[in-house]
Regions:
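One-carbon transfer enzymes
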Residues: 1-270, 285-305, 309-316, 321-331
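Short, isolated positions in well-ordered beta-strands
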Residues: 276-280, 301-304
Length: 331
């Protein structure tokens, strides 16, 4: 049977009541007052972060006929991971170990992983490349959940780049993890249209919803050792991590507007306003006219900065990130 827990049901309801999902790994939860009732299905571990994206897939995996045996996270992504957070609360509630693996491929981490005796690992947002020896520890391997239509937009920021590049469609891919980034055999995949007003936050929620629908099928395929379909990497695209991009880099107002939507809420674009860096949460293209908000000017028109703030609130550990040092990040 699936995990039975009023606590997790409440966490699930609260999560899906949000208008948008983030990748920022700083979520915490109130502690549960008791332990969950777990089933006796296949032993699975989960790898991810205390973010909306990861949490949604952890909660979905626990609704399958499984027996959770551990949670794995990567503590270098955010200071919150070293303390109490959503993953540590759920691990305690399930009565399973939480492995904070600084280097998932070293011997110490692999011994901890082997001790879980997992039949499979479900992974949703993890900032380390899992090597062949770690991938081979669970009997049926690792299922990775990547928010793009692989092989397009491989890499760490696929939702950002789909919006910033002006794509009309993206999707979610559930694939067998391989030692190469986002390159393993595909077990399930679904497309999601990108609307003209989608931000990274609203699009991520749509992608997760589609991924949750596909998870049972992909998980069954993983346990059945189905080979999946190899992506054609000759037609792939790989995009790098994103820093706080300056809207002055944009060639047009349309491009700048996409940069704003792509950066919200995970990694905000910025622009100088009266000589001071401001981080832009929302903006719209306009013809040249008077407005009460700051306007950036481009060859194709203006970009009205509808909502800005003084700090970025990002999770990247960058020494000169503005919310730490008061200067524009150089990433």
């Amino acid at each position: 049977m699936a995990v039975v827990s009023e606590y997790l049901d409440r966490v699930r309801r609260d999560l899906w009541a949000q208008e948008l999902f983030t990748f920022i790994p700083d979520r915490d939860l109130p502690p549960a007052s008791n332990e969950a009732t777990v089933g006796d299905g296949p032993r699975i571990a989960f790898a991810g972060f205390p973010s909306d994206y990861s949490l949604a897939f952890l909660l979905a995996a626990l609704q399958l006929e499984v027996r959770p045996c551990g949670i794995i996270t990567s503590p270098g992504a955010h200071p919150a991971i070293l303390g109490d957070n959503a993953l540590s609360r759920i691990a305690a509630h399930l009565g399973v170990p939480l492995i904070r693996a600084w280097r998932i491929n070293d011997e110490h981490a692999r011994l901890h992983l082997a001790a879980l005796d997992a039949e499979a690992v479900v992974m949703a947002s993890f900032d380390q490349i899992v090597g062949a020896r770690a991938l081979a520890i669970p009997r049926h391997g690792w299922l990775n959940i990547h928010p793009s239509l692989l092989p397009l937009f491989r890499g760490p920021e696929p939702v950002y780049w789909a919006i910033a590049d002006g794509a009309f469609e993206t999707g979610i891919t559930l694939h067998r993890a391989a030692p190469k980034v986002d390159a393993g055999p595909i077990l399930a995949q679904g497309a999601v249209a990108i609307q003209p007003d989608d931000s990274a936050g609203t699009l991520t929620k749509k992608l997760v919803s589609r991924g949750v629908e596909l998870l049972p099928r992909a998980f069954d395929a993983l346990l059945a050792d189905e080979p999946g379909t190899m992506p054609d990497l000759s037609h792939s695209s790989y995009r790098t991590s994103v820093g706080h991009r300056s809207l002055e880099e944009a060639a047009t107002a349309a491009e700048a507007e996409r940069m704003v939507r792509a950066g919200f809420p995970n990694m905000l674009a910025w622009a100088p306003v009266d000589g001071v860096p401001r981080y832009v949460c929302s903006a719209k293209t306009i013809a040249d006219r008077e407005t009460r908000h700051p306007v950036l000017h481009y060859p194709d028109g203006g970009l009205e900065l509808v909502e800005t703030r003084a700090t970025c609130g990002c999770h990247h550990d960058v020494a000169d990130c503005p919310h730490r040092e008061g200067a524009v990040a150089s990433v």
